[in-house]
Amino acid sequence: MPKVLLHDIEARRALARGVQKLAAAIESTLGPKGMNAMVDRPIGTPIVSRDGVTIASEIELPDRFENMGAQVVREVSMQTNEVAGDGTTTAMVLANGLIQGGVAALERGAKAVDLCKGIDRAVEVVVESLKSAAIPVSDRRTLQAVATIASTDSHLGDLIAEAVERVGKDGIISSDYGLTTSTTLEVVEGMSFDRGYISHHMVTDVEKMEVVLEQPYILLTDLKIKAPGELAAVRARVAETGKPLVIVAEEIAPEVVVTLLGEGNRGKVLVVNPPDYGHWRKAMMDDLAIITGGRVIARELGGMLEEASLADLGTARQVRASARETVIIRGGGDDAAIAARRQQVAKQHDLAPPNIEQDKLKERLAKLSGGTAVIFAGGVTPVEQKRTIQLIDDALSAARAAAEEGIVPGGGTALAQCAPVVVRALGNINGDLGEGIKLVRETLSRPAAFIARNAGHDAAKVVAELQSSRAGVGFDAANGVFIDMVSAGIVDPVRVTYTALRNAASVATLVLTTNTLVADVPEYVDPTQGPALGGGAEKLGRA
């Protein structure tokens, strides 16, 4: 197919126009008094949203070259959302400022490479300043504030803060479609895995179809249990204590199950299959052993069930099992051993490539942390529930980011107050490098300026007062006053703030160092061809 090309400054101008058009649709949504954007859909009612990534994902520009710029910046918002869960609009506001100012600098004769080096140096100074100023999160109130700002819903913020508080920042917290119109939280304490009882004849709670065993011993093995006699010795030892027995075994013969179910053993024994498959199963069994304080009677170590003693068995305060899931609550493992195992898995997770292996390690880390939570999204329609799930996921990412790396004053305050830091660190650098540094310094105040402008205030006055105020004092756009932002609960996770800036600088560097654009030649469609109504005459009439 024939191509059309655009070169040099005309190419960068086209990209900048596309970025500006996309940003114009996003910038007015920023802040507590930002306006909505309404997006038409081919079927159904329009989307009404103030979420930057939602709006950006719906925008395609008719000019192919301008659309390239819009799509590149849209990717910035999506990357920011994926990493930090929030800050999508801020990332696009920053990117637009850097790109428009950068293109203007290039037209004045600046060299793109030096300009971009200056941008990168200034950004890293700001990132280090933000990280060093981050305030650790130590209370539920702050987590709730972060989640509420990210989701724009105080109820969701409260549920997410409760979930993080109850299962920990490394615990499993997921979202799902609810069965009612209300959004609710369900928390399961302990380690859970997706394997249930192997026979419903083991059930102790008929109404819930669950097996609930109090203070059981837990036998873990990868051996194939072929005959009832293999378990006779260990069952006798457990029976002497008067406690029930949970067996987690890879394979157990039907005649063994029949023997276990007989003799009035309901409520005294539970058999479940081990979690996962392959080498992940072995790792999960080892995790279970550490959590419960037992050991895996393993084939490769020459283990024999007949020789198993009570010291080889794990314990727990309670074990609950349904047809699909087993939960071990308050395992009897040593706290120091569990912490060491968690640290080991966390290190493996950090070194693993971002694929299925990292996901599995993250799942193991969460299980070792001792809890799972599910937030069920309520709503009248599936569309409403889907939107709620998106908000939950974004707010959850933001809350976790805050718990892991801390918070900074929100409302654009932290970025705006980093401008003097850039001056002190890099103010003596001139030339094109200095031009890039100056560009970052001027762009840092843009989010605060748009928040003030969208609330009906004089952006220039607000920014000037903001940069002269003491650290942490920012502009509460909702009430039109300057206050201590952290005390007021107007905060952002530091990861959200520096990720937005880094991603904005990355895309700006890409645009400013682009010299050629290549696109397909638009195809001419003859309106008189095809089965259009009226033979195409209605199209000719519009033309």
Curated annotation (Swiss-Prot):
Catalytic activity: ATP + H2O + a folded polypeptide = ADP + phosphate + an unfolded polypeptide
Principal cellular location given in the protein's record: cytoplasm
Alphabetized GO MF terms: ATP binding; ATP-dependent protein folding chaperone; isomerase activity; unfolded protein binding
UniProt-listed Enzyme Commission number(s): 5.6.1.7
Entry GO CC: GroEL-GroES complex
Keywords linked to the UniProt accession: ATP-binding, Chaperone, Cytoplasm, Isomerase, Nucleotide-binding
SUPFAM superfamilies: GroEL apical domain-like, GroEL equatorial domain-like, GroEL-intermediate domain like
Family note: Belongs to the chaperonin (HSP60) family.
Name recorded for this polypeptide: Chaperonin GroEL 4
Species of origin: Bradyrhizobium diazoefficiens (strain JCM 10833 / BCRC 13528 / IAM 13628 / NBRC 14792 / USDA 110)
Lineage of origin: Bacteria, Pseudomonadati, Pseudomonadota, Alphaproteobacteria, Hyphomicrobiales
